[in-house]
């Protein structure tokens, strides 16, 4: 079996693939699952270390696969052509991407799919430390949490009123369930909140 995921240093889908695999090891009670699917296929190997109920995965600065079992691309979207060509058997992708491209997918249980607010405490037990700090403002540690989509209107937006109107339009579309918007990203209407910053 050959698996592909995006570079965790460059794409959130990549570090989330690592988190999901670490969560799966615990959820299914399969010690060594992370090493067999991802960790053991790198040089040096990537270890999932469990201490006091938290699993930490420290990534090297450069993700170098040591064998053909794993493929890493800069963005998850670049895995699709590799999947189509038969270069990999599975790709870690968001379900919305799979739906958009007509791909088959495996539904993961809520305990590991990073999509359930009820399992937020479980997700937080997995930490991924990136091999370098890409952005000064957000640090290099990623802690598991439910995936959410967000929008903002920058304080220095040249047309803030129009930008807020656009945000309202998008939120209304989510609330109404517009055709073409995949189910996984349709939020609870009560959860969608916009904060308007004033200076």
Predicted regions and their residues:
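Exported/periplasmic ABC-transporter solute-binding proteins
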Residues: 1-199
């Amino acid at each position: 079996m050959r698996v592909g995921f995006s570079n965790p240093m460059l794409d959130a889908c990549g570090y989330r693939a690592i988190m999901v695999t670490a969560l799966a090891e615990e959820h299914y009670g399969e010690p060594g699952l992370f090493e067999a699917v991802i960790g053991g296929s790198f040089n040096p190997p990537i270890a999932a270390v469990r201490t006091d109920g938290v699993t930490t995965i420290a990534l090297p600065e450069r993700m170098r696969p040591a064998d053909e079992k794993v493929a890493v691309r800069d963005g998850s979207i670049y895995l699709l052509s590799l999947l189509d060509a038969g270069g990999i058997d599975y790709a870690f992708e968001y379900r919305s991407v799979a739906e958009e491209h007509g791909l088959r997918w495996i539904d993961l249980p809520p305990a590991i799919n990073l999509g359930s607010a009820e399992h937020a405490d479980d997700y937080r037990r997995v930490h991924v430390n990136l091999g370098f700090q890409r952005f000064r403002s957000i640090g290099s540690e990623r802690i598991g949490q439910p995936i959410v989509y967000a929008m903002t209107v920058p304080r220095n937006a040249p047309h803030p009123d129009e930008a807020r109107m656009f945000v309202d339009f998008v939120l209304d579309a989510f609330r109404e369930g517009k055709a073409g918007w995949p189910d996984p990203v349709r939020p609870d209407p009560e959860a969608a909140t916009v904060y308007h910053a004033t200076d």
